[in-house]
Amino acid sequence: MKAIMIVYNQAHTEKIEYMLDKLGIKGYSLWENVQGRGTSSGVPHLGTHAWPEINKSVITVVDDEIVDSILNTIKKIDEINDEVGIRAFVWDVLKTV
């Protein structure tokens, strides 16, 4: 199993929800009003007057076989407009209760 955390500009919300539904991913946790900035490019997303954009973040735990489909979809979303911002991070899930 893998944990995938997706951090994205809130403008991508409908695309992320659609992807989760289309890939049959039912379980996830969502954080709203996530602040931050990219490591190499893009503007800060801080929800302030100076930097008004804001992010969301979702984490889901999935079988290994679906990881590449998720990452490919994230890459396609990012390629549509790389200035809006979306990133995905994958971790091994060794145990769960």
Q: Can you describe what each PLM-predicted range is?
A:
Residues 1-97:
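Positively charged, small/polar-rich N-terminal and surface patches that mediate targeting and assembly
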